[in-house]
Amino acid sequence: MKNKSLLILLFCSSIIFSQQQDKDGIYLNVEKMTGIKGGFGAVAKKIKYPKVAVKMRMQGVVYVGFVVNPEGKVENSKILKSVAEILDEEALRVVEKEIEFEPGYHEGKAVPVRFVLPIKFQLSAAQKAKYQL
């Protein structure tokens, strides 16, 4: 009985881990994952912290989900975890217009890849001092 349970468990786990695409044909796991040109530092440099958000002491991490197509372009971006609408809008602007991505590759071919990018909004000491936070 233990052997049968173990075989069933191994079979099911191999099916789960072998699924590399979702129902839309977007890859979830690839040999070479999509990447941000310039790394995460490039993301931080592109963020323009909204003045209203600074005055209101808004901070947090916005999670943006999207697909990087085989040409490295962003498609179907959406907020997965929100902090505040004004920060969400800035996060989407950065992802859609400011950052360049390297495409993901599977079996030597560029493929569409689902990606989640956390964008951290944290007030600097200068911003806190300016508005006496």
Where are these regions (language model features)?
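Sec-dependent N-terminal signal peptides
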Residues: 4-14
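Charge-biased low-complexity segments
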Residues: 5-6, 18-133
